[in-house]
Amino acid sequence: MSQAVKDYYEILGVNRDATKEEIKKAYRKLVRIYHPDINPDPSAQEKFKEINEAYHVLIDDERRSEYDAILSRNDVGKFRDFLEYIQEFVESIIQGEKGKKRRPRKGQDIKMKLPLTLEEAGLGCEKEIIYSRWMDCPVCEGMGVKGEAETVVCHACNGEGRRVSGIFNFPRPCSVCKGKGFIVKNPCPTCYGRGRVSAQHKIKVHIPPGTEEGEVLKVPEKGHLGYFGGKPGDLYLKVVLKEHPIFKKVGKDLHMEKVVSFPLAVLGGTVKVPTLEGEEIDVFIQPGTECGATKVVKEKGYPYENGRGDLIIHIRIGVPKNLSKSERKLLEKLAESIKEEGEEVYREGGSLVEKLSSLFKKNA
């Protein structure tokens, strides 16, 4: 599941047509609230980073224009690349890393939904999944250049990799060389000099028995590639149970409908019923079972850590649609003997009451 496009205007609390002065004013106000030296709350540090993210995007005309285009199209893919760079230089600003070697940093986590059948989630399985992940470019092996690197000193920052600007004179990574201090003359044509590409990745994930809807499975170090030699991020899979053609899961129980014939409902007998394992079991139906009755089969429901729920069968009585003449006569004879008081059973060709009613309508 991809990173959503953040609304930096909302984060700073300004309108989308806000001037630079309005952006600076909103930024100063929020910094006084969330700066780590002022606010000791651990959550304030993350909020402070996000505020700086928003400010350093919106205060720069070129960067703001690029962001506005991404936001208007809700282009999650473009924003992922954009966010990676923004977070990198904001962190370097906050940490005061000017002129220092970049330290290894863990890659971004990946969060996505994992659709599972009831069988896969309930009984457990090894599930193969394919997803997109940032990896080293296979052509340049993560170097970002084609062949031997040909570089020139960045004219914008004179090789410093940083330029001082902004209301607090913060050193910011140079937007021309992306903070490197040099410009590669022969960037890799596959990754455009980034050293990494988004590639399809295939893994097998263990699904434990009794996995529930909404449960999140963590797969360590299967997220995006790390930065500067750092570890990859983690992969988080949120379980979504698919609709089942037979069973409906309610808590730990499985519910299903079973159609039985009228004679079996009256006389009793056994029917074949499927289980989650794909087997069939014999279930006894009591004589005189009515439509809508339920039959509970213990411990044949959804698995969980210490056992299993029940299988609850909702009985429906099937009504035959096409009867032969002999079958109809037998049923008519039976109906006469077991019908309730006040009932008039239609015979073939209509009942006496029906014929008299039709005659009166013709003479009216």
Swiss-Prot record:
Residues reported in the UniProt entry to bind Zn(2+) 2: 154, 157, 174, 177
Details of cofactor binding: Binds 2 Zn(2+) ions per monomer.
Cofactor(s) of this protein: Zn(2+)
Domain J, residue spans: 7-71
Keywords for the protein's UniProt record, in alphabetical order: Chaperone, Cytoplasm, DNA replication, Metal-binding, Repeat, Stress response, Zinc, Zinc-finger
CDD domains per UniProt: DnaJ, DnaJ_C, DnaJ_zf
Matches recorded under Pfam families: DnaJ, DnaJ_C, DnaJ_CXXCXGXG
One Gene Ontology term from the biological process aspect of the record: chaperone cofactor-dependent protein refolding
Ranges for the CXXCXGXG motif repeats: 137-144, 154-161, 174-181, 188-195
InterPro entries: DnaJ, DnaJ_C, DnaJ_domain, HSP40/DnaJ_pept-bd, HSP_DnaJ_Cys-rich_dom, HSP_DnaJ_Cys-rich_dom_sf, J_dom_sf
Binding positions (Zn(2+) 1): 137, 140, 188, 191
Positions of CR-type zinc fingers: 124-200
HAMAP family per UniProt: DnaJ (MF_01152)
Assembly information from the UniProt record: Homodimer.
Function description: Participates actively in the response to hyperosmotic and heat shock by preventing the aggregation of stress-denatured proteins and by disaggregating proteins, also in an autonomous, DnaK-independent fashion. Unfolded proteins bind initially to DnaJ; upon interaction with the DnaJ-bound protein, DnaK hydrolyzes its bound ATP, resulting in the formation of a stable complex. GrpE releases ADP from DnaK; ATP binding to DnaK triggers the release of the substrate protein, thus completing the reaction cycle.
Protein family according to the UniProt entry: Belongs to the DnaJ family.
Domains as described in the record: The J domain is necessary and sufficient to stimulate DnaK ATPase activity. Zinc center 1 plays an important role in the autonomous, DnaK-independent chaperone activity of DnaJ. Zinc center 2 is essential for interaction with DnaK and for DnaJ activity.
The protein, known as: Chaperone protein DnaJ 1
Organism, scientific name: Aquifex aeolicus (strain VF5)
This protein's encoding gene: dnaJ1
